[in-house]
Amino acid sequence: MTSRNFAALDSRVFDVLVIGGGIFGACAAWDATLRGLSVALVERADFCSGVSANSYKFVHGGIRYLQHADLWRLRRSCAERSRLLRLAPHLVSPVPVVIPTFARPRQGKALLGAGMLVYDALTLDRNRGIRDKARRIPLARFIGKDEVLGLFPDLPKRDLTGAAIFWDGQMYNPSRLVLAFVRSAMEQGAVAVNYAEAEKLLLSDEAVDAVRIRDHLTGDHVEVKAKVVLNAAGPWAPWLLEELDRDKGVLRGSYSRDACFVVRRRFSHPYAIALQGKTRDPDAILSRAARHLFLTPWRNYTLCGVWHRVWSEHPDDVRIMPDELERFIDEVNEAMPGLGLKMSDVTMWNAGLVPFGDNDSGASDLRYGKRSHLIDHARAHGIRNLVTLIGVRYTMARADAARAVDLVCAKIDPKLGPSRTDRTPLLGAGFERFDALAASVARAVAGEAGKDAAAALAHNYGTEYRNVLRLGAEPEIGRGCLAGSTTFRAEVAHAVREEMACHLSDIVFRRTDLATGGHPGRALQEAAALAARELGWDEATRREELAIVERRFIIGEEAGFAAPQRIPVSEGEALAGAGA
């Protein structure tokens, strides 16, 4: 990956222009380049700064679809989880999940055990092709009451009989996984530019003649031409097409504001836990009475979620009000009374929009969106070279993007081959065993950083870690980590020079581990100083960049409009945006 080059968007007519640099757009760009297409990818903010960045970090294997008797989705989800464990083993790994059982109707071992048995039988091929044993998904098992209380002593003991344990996938860093797809596409010749917003489709003769793109860093505009335009802008996709869709209503539908938050609690083990929430799934055929809330170890913190709310406002306005956050905390405390969470325990929150089912704005028991929306606008609006993909599940992004690129290829050249992303490892994934890679990194950084920092470097960059460490030899950057962190000083420079980081927030939230769970402390000032040197900021700009990052950690009365990411523009303003 090289430095940002907005001018390259005006260099030629591309085969496909992908709008949206989240997981769906990144997967589509990677897929199209592997099929030999020339690709441009534009993102209005930073790559993976919206919905994709703020997910719950799970790569789901489809067990939830048992209660819907939707075996097709179950099998597809399991297959995609397996592929991510193979194609990006440094960024995805198994996580054990505990589901407590009780001597109550629909919450006992018999029903849950039957479900686990069926799931294991339906997914016997889940580890096919996964070379690293540490990345394989084990069979489910049961533990007794004493053992589950040993793991989670704050569980309510009344009627508790034990627990089931199943394994799912967890992303180490969702933003870096998206970046791995973007970087892989660029290695194959794609042009990718962040802070480049698609403002308007320029139509003529029942086709998109060009797309007007604005550079948020300079205010410049360019008209990008492509044979096919793939709109993968997530919840912003309908707004881009609002004028086109005004009379058709093809893109209308409800969106869920999915929310989760990070708290100052640290489990002494790697197990997540699924607790009974207060809402039900009206589409479930077989149900354990309520939807699950998850508490998951997340670095040195705990991630809690997910809560859903029908959202009808603009995606730029996504927010969580303080009273909502208090209700979320109360619900967790009710499910696990001994936990005793308070508002002061919350270090960060994430929220964003995903397509939902048909729901009224005041509904509490909500219907999930079941499948991504893939729209051929030749049929929907008579625009022959426009395709829209609005994704639902991060896990399914690769497969859904492949379907979208199939449609793109049919419009360009039906003889183009099938997708290869199901078997092509991402950049940095060229290793057999992650523990061996981490050991190699530890040896390389011996004397300047500990094992935790070495492991983090291996997770974030895979075999590309050497390109990061090489920058530490420059005296003005220096070796070792930022104060009190596992982030190497060289990672800041690498983010700017090789990964298009344009703002301090890009570095802190999406390129490094500095703020994956909470405020990075003194390391933030050091990172700002390094970024200022790399990007040529004056003191006023450095302070402004710091202020934007600091606002991300406001919890409480001022949190109502504190969106997870902002787009700093030339006038010094900040446009709110979010995602989950």
What are these regions (language model features)?
Residues P174-R176, S184, D245-G305, R309-A523, ...:
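C-terminal catalytic lobe of FAD-dependent flavoproteins
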Residues N231-R246:
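Flavin (primarily FAD) binding-site architecture
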Residues R12-F14, T218-V228:
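Core beta-strand elements of the Rossmann-like FAD/NAD(P) dinucleotide-binding domain
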Residues N194-D209:
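A conserved short coil-to-beta-strand element within the FAD-binding core of flavoproteins
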Residues T33-A53:
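Glycine-rich FAD pyrophosphate-binding loop
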Residues K57-L151, A290-L293:
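Dinucleotide-binding Rossmann-like beta1-alpha1 core, especially the glycine-rich loop
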Residues G129-A134, L139, L149-Q188, A210-R212, ...:
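Helix-loop-beta segment of a Rossmann-like dinucleotide-binding subdomain
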Residues M1-V16, D31-R35:
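Extreme N-terminal leader/targeting segments of oxidoreductases
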